[in-house]
């Protein structure tokens, strides 16, 4: 072989060009189900970040949320300041509460609840989940997490842009936003930029002076970021969300931070034309699970003080509505503290015949819900429209009977249904002749898994011989 042969010689085994993707025979570009069905709001994979969600299976719960909370005028003194999404299925974790909450959070923020409430309310949503292992045990720690979630949502940045636009239109009535901004995101970025304002001959100092004439901002302390960071008329700068973060971190834990969150920020949000906010607290049990009886009572007392009976602006008007997700058993954990602190009189943790609007029962799914759930996931990963296959094509390659079986063995638990569907589809993709997933295939795979599991247990528990001791004659 000369020096050029290796460049021109072809291998004897050629690559097959007509090879199909692993799930292509099922008209899918990938396995649409999550391999580990745990929800992570910030993940890039839509299978686990909650974006693939069939709201129809939680239509009842969503309508209760809309009618009991989102549509009630915030100026109604009896509007609810706290609510519970309470698991009544008793099937353990994985009933879809987190996915529901994340989608509710996104739905509220899409139109700031203006569309949902027919312009009665303008509210934003903040989603948070207490840290595991007892790291969110005190009310102060929860509030730190709450403010972090506010920052992550960029709602302060949004409000700063809204307040500046309002002031700019007052100072310059002929200012046309559509000529300067491509869309909402562009507007928010530019109105939070000192450089852009200067380039367009808009003095940030004069703009800030106009902003501070807002009736909700006049009473704020002079340490509040809008007052503290103004810049001079010669070297002006805009206040950014980072200034709010720095200000909060410089406040002492306890009263100073509570005053900022439940009074000063409320006035700031009101100045940006919001009249309410929903604080969605997932996995609430992570807090009382690690609290002593006294810590539970102190936590409930502070909650009552900030939401109902204290002197904070929020307690007076009910700007924030806290929605707590409670797994089965959590009410029993906090019932005594709720009663001792007086919270039971404000927002009963125990359902009654007369006061139930603040409690949204989260019930077990049924077989039809399981069918709708699988259809939703499958539709997100279709390679092409497949209407010609017939009425039940949306479920392909699953049959309806197969889904009923999956739901049955999964105890109607959403996470288990999705995980089993993932495993079945993954297995079927490796069997050339397996063109569909029917009830028989489901039973065969389940039986095989049970046998494999029992074999592993048998091996693990089998009597063993210590060969070293045997060789030594022991």
Each language-model region and where it sits:
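A short acidic (Asp/Glu
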Residues: 94-102, 137-143, 288-294, 331-338, ...
């Amino acid at each position: 072989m000369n020096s050029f042969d290796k460049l021109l010689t072809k291998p004897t085994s050629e690559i097959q060009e007509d090879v199909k993707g692993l799930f292509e025979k099922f008209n899918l570009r990938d396995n649409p189900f999550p391999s580990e069905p745990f929800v992570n709001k910030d993940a890039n994979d839509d299978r686990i970040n909650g974006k693939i969600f069939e709201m129809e299976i939680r239509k009842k719960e969503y309508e209760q949320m809309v009618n009991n909370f989102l549509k009630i005028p915030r100026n109604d003194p009896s509007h609810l300041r706290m609510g519970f999404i309470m698991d009544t299925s008793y099937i353990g974790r994985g009933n879809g509460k987190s996915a529901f909450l994340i989608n509710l959070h996104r739905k509220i923020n899409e139109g700031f609840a203006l569309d949902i409430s027919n312009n009665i309310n303008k509210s934003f949503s903040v989603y948070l989940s207490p840290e595991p292992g007892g790291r969110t045990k005190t009310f102060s720690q929860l509030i730190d997490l709450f403010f972090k979630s506010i920052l992550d949502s960029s709602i302060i940045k949004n409000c700063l842009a809204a307040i500046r636009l309002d002031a700019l239109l007052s100072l310059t009535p002929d200012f046309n936003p559509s000529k300067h901004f491509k869309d909402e995101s562009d507007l928010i970025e530019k109105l939070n930029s000192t450089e852009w304002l200067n380039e367009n001959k808009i003095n940030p100092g004069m703009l800030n002076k106009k902003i501070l004439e807002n009736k909700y901002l006049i009473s704020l302390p002079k340490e509040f970021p809008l007052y503290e960071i103004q810049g001079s008329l010669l070297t002006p700068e805009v206040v950014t969300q980072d200034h709010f973060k720095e200000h909060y971190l410089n406040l002492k834990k306890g009263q100073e931070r509570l005053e900022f969150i439940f009074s000063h920020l409320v006035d700031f949000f009101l100045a940006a034309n919001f009249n309410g906010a929903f604080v969605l607290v997932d996995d609430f049990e992570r807090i009382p699970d690690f609290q002593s009886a006294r810590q539970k009572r102190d936590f409930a007392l502070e909650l009552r003080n900030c939401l109902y009976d204290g002197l904070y602006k929020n307690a007076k008007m009910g700007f924030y509505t806290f929605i707590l997700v409670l797994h089965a058993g959590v009410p029993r954990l906090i019932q005594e503290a709720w009663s001792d602190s007086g919270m039971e009189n404000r927002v009963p943790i125990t359902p009654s015949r007369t006061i139930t609007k603040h409690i949204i029962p989260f019930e077990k799914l049924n077989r039809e819900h399981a069918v709708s759930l699988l259809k939703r996931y499958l539709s997100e990963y279709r390679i092409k429209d497949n209407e010609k296959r017939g009425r039940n094509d949306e479920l392909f390659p699953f049959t309806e009977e197969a889904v009923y079986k999956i739901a049955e063995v999964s105890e109607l638990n959403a996470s288990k249904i999705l995980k089993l569907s993932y495993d079945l589809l993954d297995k079927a993709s490796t069997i050339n002749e397996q063109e569909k997933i029917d009830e028989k295939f489901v039973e065969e795979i389940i039986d095989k898994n049970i046998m494999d599991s029992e074999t592993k247990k048998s091996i693990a528990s089998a009597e063993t011989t210590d060969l070293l001791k045997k060789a030594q004659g022991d």
